[in-house]
Amino acid sequence: MREDHSPRRNNTIENTLTELLPNRLYFGCFPNPDAIDKSDKSVKKTCFININNKFHYEPFYEDFGPWNLSVLYRLCVQVGKLLEVEEKRSRRVVLFCQDDGTGQYDKIRVNTAYVLGAYLIIYQGFSADDAYLKVSSGETVKFVGFRDASMGSPQYLLHLHDVLRGIEKALKFGWLDFSDFDYEEYEFYERVENGDFNWIIPGKILSFCGPHNESREENGYPYHAPDVYFDYFRENKVSTIVRLNAKNYDASKFTKAGFDHVDLFFIDGSTPSDEIMLKFIKVVDNTKGGVAVHCKAGLGRTGTLIACWMMKEYGLTAGECMGWLRVCRPGSVIGPQQPYLIEKQKFCWSLSQSNGVHLTQNKEEKRNVRRLVNQVDDINLGEERISPKSRENTRPNILRRRVQVQNGRSTAPVTIAPAGTSESRRSTKPSRVVDETALDDQGRSQGDRLLQLKAKHQHESETTSPNSSSSRRFVKSSTPQMTVPSQAYLNRNREPIIVTPSKNGTSSGTSSRQLKTTPNGNVAYRTRNSSGNTTSTLTRTGNESYRFHNSLFYEPASAVFPSMASRRSETTRYLSPTTPIKPMSPSYTDGTSPRYKARLRSENPIGSTTSTPFSLQPQITKCSLTAESKPPKRILSMPGTSKSTSSLKKIQVSRPRPYPSTGVRVELCANGKSYDIRPRKEAHVIPGAGLAANTEALLGVCKLVNTLS
């Protein structure tokens, strides 16, 4: 008989342990983890991982999740690695969250359950229903619902089950594929200074903030001009721009660049009319390429119309749409827009015959009619009673009764109904009613406030980081800590891949091919080769350089240092923003780490100890000026050298030459079209030869003789 090493529930503390994978993975909630009996045999064979303070959600107001797509990916990869390592040691893994007295326990708890449920769906083949039952089976206190990013009391609470069903539908329709996902790229483009956009349906619908006529910074938020997005949109085949807010830029800037532009304005914080919704659905249906949708912040109005098209095209429910939207772009769909989507759910389904909803709806309606006809004589007008059998088939109220605390005193409990029910759409004695369409005292609309909050939180996250010392381990072992590896990837079987470095300092999957560039000289940054070989996945260097200029850039260090050629492949992918733009002039990252200095030594054969990267200066004989504009070249050609990069490696460079050199001047030729480099002083020139012909008459012969002598 096999010995059961499952961690037992300790009677000395109030906790719950939920078995997700038999004898492998558990989910726990510990009010006091120090009370665990470490001498217990089952505890010694268990690896405890504290999820508190590992990831942080940047709220707009009182919203707290779900955690975005990058956090979901990193946690799933880490869980897979932990299970693989601990299974070889016959140890179990318990991911737990604890009540640290900060009031965030319920929020962290439901976010952890969401990530573990998504892991079961993505990697273990669970359905969303089974995954939800797994994570909630051992919980005595039900999960709270996710609220929106509005200022007032929530009008709707998003159910954990709806979020998991949104993940399941995204996996089904190909929107989610962690075997080809770049979380660093996702986090880069999500930042306000780098464009502030996210793919909702990869390759089809992109959500971004509203551009302005010119790039500027206002109230801490950087606004972008339309031309900032041109390169990225062209590279990712975005052909149509839909504007939902007031005109803050000239639409001709997009149309002159070859994009289609559509205006569908409605008030910030409000819901669209049926006419606007139908026009938007028609625009998306008739567009062959991608559609970039924006309002002011790209959250409320943008997410609402995108959800309407998703319900029409794929037959998703309103809750599933909101769940997936907030995973991709946190803060989407706000205030009254939530009950609006629930109200328009069946209407959106009826707009398409290909979403698979109609056949099920018709059969269900006929079945209900027959049932009503057969039971019409048994209708009871008295008090409604639910039989135990029918109660098993109904969805339980999974959200607990919360007690509002004001001034240290508990008031009447407020029942929070599960999302998707009529009770959840009715606010029970709201403490604060806010009109999301109204302007505040400073004249800011909902979008203005959200933009400033997002910029503020992202700026604060740069200066503060989670306390890594808060992670608690109860059993000493060599198991890796709960830190996200920068070199973790997944293959097509959704298994983590660890790229091991070789003796020469590069990864085992190093490729010798050149960097692929776009026609304008930018680097195409990919993740997979065309053959699907995942061993060529790029290893993270840790020295990526982020820079904002006149376009959207994402520059890996391999583009700055030629010896670290990128191992990104040439296959087009659509699971995240896929073609980052590289600036025309390389920008360097000042680094003082030993690995950075070691790489500089390997790049500089002379052994320079300076941390400033050097550049090769060619010998320039003449610089021609032409009227036509040519795209700048990435590498300046050396006189007398071939195009092969191998010849450049043989050049020994000690230090860059100053240009122009000492004693050299640049003179414009008579034709006015070119420059010549000449010495500063002409040799063998008679003194006074350069004076004017009438100098003697002006100065006098005596003075001139004295001057020349």
Curated annotation (Swiss-Prot):
Show the active-site residues: C295 (phosphocysteine intermediate)
| InterPro entries hit by this protein | CDC14_C (IPR044506), DSPn (IPR029260), Prot-tyrosine_phosphatase-like (IPR029021), PTP (IPR050561), Tyr_Pase_AS (IPR016130), Tyr_Pase_dom (IPR000387), TYR_PHOSPHATASE_DUAL_dom (IPR020422)
**Residue ranges for motif Nuclear localization signal?**
366-371
| Pfam families tied to this protein | DSPn (PF14671), Tc-R-P (PF22785)
- Which catalytic reaction applies to this protein? O-phospho-L-tyrosyl-[protein] + H2O = L-tyrosyl-[protein] + phosphate
Protein's cellular compartments: Cytoplasm; Cytoplasm, Cytoskeleton, Microtubule organizing center, Centrosome; Cytoplasm, Cytoskeleton, Spindle; Midbody
Quote the biased-composition stretches of kind Polar residues, using this chain's numbering: 404-413, 480-490, 501-521, 639-649
- The residue ranges of the Tyrosine-protein phosphatase domain are 196-354
Q: What domain of life does the UniProt record list for this protein's source?
A: Eukaryota
Q: Anything known on activity regulation?
A: Inhibited by sodium orthovanadate. Weakly inhibited by sodium fluoride and okadaic acid.
Write down the top EC class of this protein.
hydrolase
One GO-annotated biological process of the protein: mitotic cytokinesis
Region named Disordered: 403-541, 573-594, 628-661
Q: Which UniProt keywords apply?
A: Cell cycle, Cell division, Cytoplasm, Cytoskeleton, Hydrolase, Microtubule, Nucleus, Protein phosphatase
PANTHER family the record matches: TYROSINE SPECIFIC PROTEIN PHOSPHATASE AND DUAL SPECIFICITY PROTEIN PHOSPHATASE (PTHR23339)
Functionally, this protein is described as follows: Protein phosphatase that negatively regulates the G1-to-S phase transition to inhibit the cell cycle and establish quiescence in cells of multiple lineages including vulval, hypodermal and intestinal. Promotes nuclear accumulation and activity of the cyclin-dependent kinase inhibitor cki-1 which leads to inhibition of G1 progression during vulval tissue development. Has been shown to not be required for cytokinesis.
- Name the record gives this protein: Tyrosine-protein phosphatase cdc-14
**What is the native source organism of this protein?**
Caenorhabditis elegans
The gene from which this protein is expressed is cdc-14
